[in-house]
Amino acid sequence: ILLKNGKIYDGTGADAFLGNILVRGDRIEKIGEGLICDGAQVIDLQGLSVSSGFMDAHSHNDWFAIRKDPRPFFEPFIRQGITSFITGNCGLSATGFTPDTPYLDKIGGGLFGYRGDETSVYPSAGALLDAADGRSPCNIAVLVGHCSARAGITGFDGRDLTPAEEEQMLGAMEKSLKEGACGVSLGLMYEPGLYVSIEELKKVARLAERYDLPMTVHPRACSAVSMTYPLLGRPPLLRALDELVEITRGTRMKLQYSHAIFVGRRSFRCKDELKEIIY
């Protein structure tokens, strides 16, 4: 296929330029001006723009990737130009748990989940990434979710883990990091992350730091009033950020705060202090 006369944005940040693109099979073979190819199907893009695919940097589409036929779920994204996804966010990954878990129904925190014959089960990232590479029409990177790893050990039980359970959880997460997971995610607003101690979260943070990989965090609160914290005192969304500072104190790890949002008008007054803490 020869795409002619398009305004090309190559994704590097360089200025757009007019040119042609030669596609052979599922690969771009050449980009440039004046390209010709005998026998190629020619599509004239006069007046149109062409770009590299867009990336959705905060996605939960690993839960589509585990579908036995994921293509219908990805088609709407492709039609919008989105071709790559960072998945496994908010601690709720579709992978990263012990393979013999009796709590498969708890993986996904109640927001997502395995759905019988419609989905395949991938306890570690390597298996999921291999399956996605063969079946998904899009590029998938996956974070290993702390909520999923913990739920695989004790379900939604709110107690502290025993040393043996903690070792199992961290071992399942580390296995996925070794197999190509791109980082770790926490979901402190969701079960079971909602109940977890600072000390447990520090150990998860150290795991990510050891592999020099990022940790993304959905905090316990994004509002000025939250049942997660006492009603009086410092606004909950700032307490939630204080918690992340404590978890990562003394490390040189990469931390992504997701999401820096202000729920409710009373939370707006916190924006300046939140920015000061982050920066």
Protein language model features and the residues they cover:
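Short, glycine-/Ser/Thr-/acidic-enriched flexible segments
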Residues: I8, I28, L92, C147, ...
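Histidine/acidic residue-rich metal-binding segments in metalloenzymes
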Residues: A127, D160-G187, E191-Y279
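Divalent-metal coordination cores built from histidine and acidic residues
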Residues: D69-G183, D212-L213
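Divalent metal-coordination and catalytic microenvironments
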Residues: G6, I21, D26, G47, ...
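Structured core elements
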Residues: L2, L22, D56, I86, ...
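Histidine-rich, glycine-flanked metal-binding segment
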Residues: I8-G53
